[in-house]
Amino acid sequence: MGQPLKVKKRIYSQDVELVRAHIFVRGKVQGVFFRQSMKDVANKYGVKGWVRNRRDGRTVEAVLEGPKDAVLKVIEWARVGPPGARVEDLEVKWEEYKGEFNDFSILPTE
């Protein structure tokens, strides 16, 4: 028999505020690696959720869940985005935290 698997799970202390933000980033945000870059930033800060392009060709939509300070860091990054992006507008809708994600995913365009 092999060794038992060791699973890493992030556990937050009870005084950490967990939040959910639904964001829309508009401008030159498609074709500049925005989604992959956001996934990398979200993973760096331990934020879960998803990101996808919208069919209008100028909007990226994302849902971010995690500790408030980490989610705010991802939103702060999204105000500028990766090199080559030109963010014209960022809309944030705060929603009730659901804890429904295990990771951060790139979803197909909708």
Swiss-Prot record:
Annotated GO MF terms: acylphosphatase activity
Lineage, highest ranks first: Archaea, Thermoproteota, Thermoprotei, Thermoproteales, Thermoproteaceae
Active-site residues annotated for this sequence: R35, N53
Record flagged with keyword Lipid metabolism: no
Similarity remark: Belongs to the acylphosphatase family.
Pfam families cross-referenced by the UniProt entry: Acylphosphatase
Protein name per Swiss-Prot or TrEMBL: Acylphosphatase
Catalyzed reaction equations: an acyl phosphate + H2O = a carboxylate + phosphate + H(+)
EC number annotated for this UniProt entry: 3.6.1.7
Keywords from the UniProt entry: Hydrolase
Disulphide-bonded residues: none
